[in-house]
């Protein structure tokens, strides 16, 4: 015969008393190592009784009053388990607090050590950086002075180059003018030479013509004289 408690639990959708006990028993089995010896003996004794009664009930059947006894016993076991869990929680809290305290002390010590090391390292490198930056500033000042000197020299050289370009431009202009005058003079000279040559050629031609005429006249006179002489010799 099925008990009314079981019917009610199944209809309501809640876990049965046996399921609750089984879950509690499983949970307690996992945590046995952390409990004291007396608590384990109590739980094991009650668990054995419950298991024995469950076997009797499954083999021969149990009346509905047995369900109430089992329920009461399970409630007692649940109270013991809750006490054990509460004690375990308290011990765990104590261990946790002690561990946290120790960890915090270690962390504070490590943090302080690291902070001191960082501060020492920062001071050391800050001094080195400060020295380097000071040297850098001096080098920059020297570089700026050198740059200013170079710029002044460059300006002077640029001014000299500009003046030199002006002088060269003037000289080139003078050379150009002189060259133009030279070309013009050469052209005039060649023109004069051409005129002189033409005049000389004309004069030479005239002289040659006069000379030729003179030679011809002399030749004629000689021929006439020769003819006269020949005639005279023939006549006389």
Curated annotation (Swiss-Prot):
The gene is SYCP3. The keyword Cell division applies. Phosphorylated. InterPro entries: XLR/SYCP3, XLR/SYCP3/FAM9_dom. Residues 1-40 are annotated as: Disordered. Keywords: Cell cycle, Cell division, Centromere, Chromosome, Coiled coil, DNA-binding, Meiosis, Nucleus, Phosphoprotein. GO terms for molecular function: DNA binding. Disulfide bonds: none annotated. Component of the lateral elements of synaptonemal complexes. Homotetramer; the tetrameric helix bundles assemble end to end into long homopolimeric fibers that exhibit a transversal striation with a periodicity of about 20 nm (in vitro). Interacts with SYCP2. Forms a complex with EWSR1, PRDM9, REC8 and SYCP1; complex formation is dependent of phosphorylated form of REC8 and requires PRDM9 bound to hotspot DNA; EWSR1 joins PRDM9 with the chromosomal axis through REC8. Residues 69-74, 231-236 are annotated as: Important for oligomerization and fiber formation. It is linked to Spermatogenic failure 4: An infertility disorder characterized by azoospermia, a condition of having no sperm present in the ejaculate. Testicular histology shows arrest of spermatogenesis at the pachytene stage of primary spermatocytes. Belongs to the XLR/SYCP3 family. Component of the synaptonemal complexes (SCS), formed between homologous chromosomes during meiotic prophase. Required for centromere pairing during meiosis in male germ cells. Required for normal meiosis during spermatogenesis and male fertility. Plays a lesser role in female fertility. Required for efficient phosphorylation of HORMAD1 and HORMAD2. Its main location: nucleus. Testis-specific. It comes from Homo sapiens. GO terms for cellular component: chromosome, centromeric region; lateral element; nucleus; synaptonemal complex. Residues 66-223 form a coiled coil. Signal peptide: none annotated. One of its GO terms (biological process) is spermatid development. A motif (Nuclear localization signal) lies at residues 88-91. The modification Phosphoserine is found at residues 36, 38, 59. This is Synaptonemal complex protein 3. Composed of a long central coiled coil domain. The N-terminal and C-terminal regions interact with DNA. Residues 52-57, 88-91 are annotated as: Interaction with DNA.
């Amino acid at each position: 015969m099925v008990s009314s408690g079981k019917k009610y639990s199944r209809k309501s959708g809640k876990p049965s008393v046996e399921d609750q006990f089984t879950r509690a028993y499983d949970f307690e089995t996992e945590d046995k190592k952390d409990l004291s010896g007396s608590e384990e003996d109590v739980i094991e004794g009650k668990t054995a009784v419950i298991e024995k009664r469950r076997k009797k009930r499954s083999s021969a059947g149990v009346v509905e009053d047995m369900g109430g006894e089992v329920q009461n016993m399970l409630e007692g076991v649940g109270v013991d388990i809750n006490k054990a869990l509460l004690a375990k929680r308290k011990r765990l809290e104590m261990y946790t607090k002690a561990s946290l305290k120790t960890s915090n002390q270690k962390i504070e010590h490590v943090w302080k050590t690291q902070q001191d090391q960082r501060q020492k390292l920062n001071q050391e490198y800050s001094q080195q950086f400060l020295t380097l930056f000071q040297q850098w500033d001096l080098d920059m000042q020297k570089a700026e002075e050198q740059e200013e000197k170079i710029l002044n020299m460059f300006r002077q050289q640029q001014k000299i180059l500009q003046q030199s370009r002006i002088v060269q431009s003037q000289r080139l202009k003078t050379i150009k003018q002189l060259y133009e005058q030279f070309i013009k003079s050469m052209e005039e000279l060649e023109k004069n030479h051409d005129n002189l040559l033409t005049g000389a050629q004309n004069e030479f031609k005239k002289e040659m013509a006069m000379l030729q005429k003179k030679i011809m006249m002399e030749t004629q006179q000689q021929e006439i004289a020769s003819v006269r002489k020949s005639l005279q010799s023939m006549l006389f």
